[in-house]
């Protein structure tokens, strides 16, 4: 957020003109689900803008809609924000804290003739809404103020069923902006609120509550996504017609859309509830808790958001950019370790049965201070099945009958006898080591292939899960007619390697600790299941930054 953008330009103009003296923003998530990468853009813009100008950013739970809101989500949202490195200080609020004041301001609108109680049913409301050439209609628009006030009080007292009455703003039934055609401000709902319990049975609509909450908190710049641009006139109307202590300015920016991903809370909830994924923190989910469990770092996510930038135009961002950012971050700081995901046994025929020697292996070639570690070498080894081909394709430089390869950081070996199981699969491969090559390749021999390995005696057992994109279709926001996201689920989004082998030290890796498995990819120790390593991202990067 260090770079300037059009939001900063607007703020600079207001500060210079004296329309604002401070920069005070807010991040108002609805606590009915977990934050995802899309929310992260808004979060970074809100907190980042305040940081840029030395201002403040409030955290406000937008819990005016009681349906599906839960303290579980409140706690998770706080954890995610702190994980990304932001803090709201002592400025944590709930939208429901303002219910009483919001109700009083609704009464003020009624007294001033700016609101009325309407008893159109939802079907009638749609029928009388009009179109671009015909104004909306409400036979209750001229209801006396005293009658509207009495009905509004009785609505709060619980005298009427849901849908019987609403409170509507009196603005302009002929407006070309349908949001201004006497929008509903309050509706009756008999549902328990996660904080207020059953105290309230009338709840304010978002378009009414939100500007009031901003104004009561002294917010100067209300930054929100582009779908609220058409709601801005209503936002301003509420501020102008209610006795509130400040006049915030709403500024809209484009939402974040990413390829091969759905960011709709409804769809994400469905993925969880139908068991397609294993909870909100499934490592394939775009939720921040899912990305964190998979192994994404805060730095990589913030780098991604920074590269995407802030614009007014909606666009579809290649998920490859997000993968590129975490790959760059982990390449710089993740220690290297050896893992054999699909092991096949190798026996070094000319190596002593009872001997163990240790080879020095670099921890991170990008960080000289990371030093080296000792990796044990014994007669029996594990190599990856992909590094052997009995009938090799052209330009196959790994292990093959009669061929030579270097075992990484150790000896050159030559392939000899191949022993098979009854079903024809390879049971073990016998090799002969050139024991004079432990410290480097002789100058008279060219060895094109180097493969990784582990001692069969010392390697630890593990499970590795190769996570990939959850959906095969790039633009999940524009599916062909008749298709749903379920038609594009990637059957290989989580490939489990049940019999993986890893360096012995990895048996004691801390949950969430990250490594580069050499020649494979970047992995993170799972935070829930012992002995499981989640692939964060593959080693190779086909994405080309613009």
Language-model-detected regions and their locations in the chain:
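N-terminal catalytic cores of NTP/NDP-binding nucleotidyl/phosphoryl-transfer enzymes
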Residues: 3-12, 16-79, 193-225
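Core subunits and conserved enzymes of cellular information-processing
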Residues: 228-232, 236-238, 302, 306-308, ...
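A glycine-rich helix N-cap at a beta->alpha junction
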Residues: 73-99, 105-106, 113-115
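Charge-rich, well-structured scaffold segments of protease-associated domains
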Residues: 69-83, 108-111, 293, 297, ...
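Conserved short loop/turn motifs at secondary-structure junctions
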Residues: 28-32, 60-68, 90-100, 123-124, ...
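Long, charged, mostly alpha-helical binding arms that flank functional sites
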Residues: 246-325
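Active-site cores that bind ATP or allylic diphosphates and position pyrophosphate for catalysis
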Residues: 59, 63-65, 108-268, 326, ...
